[in-house]
Amino acid sequence: MAGSMAREGDMTTGHGSYAPSKFAVGSSLCQKATIEGKPMLTVDAKCEPHGSSSPSPAIIGTIIEGSPTSFVKCDDGVYRKVARIGDSLDCGCKIVWGAKTVGAGANA
């Protein structure tokens, strides 16, 4: 089954004591590739800084997982895997929001 593609404005799960975060306007590496009117997200896109209730500093997560079969050419000319609901960030978050009409690759 295809996973719903992620876009600017979509959210992450949070992790441990760190709160959920979102992908801000401008966080997409593919500003010309849109889904439901929002730029799509790929591997290497970053979420907004998210803090913790502990004294730990805020961190910024980077998408490290994407569709094994769907790639998009980003603004820098590099083809990257399309990010989907359930894909991971290097901080421990997962993507939890995504497009309602477009999916890509299989999410295990």
Where are the regions a protein language model picked out?
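Intrinsically disordered, low-complexity proline/glycine-rich segments
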Residues: M1-A108
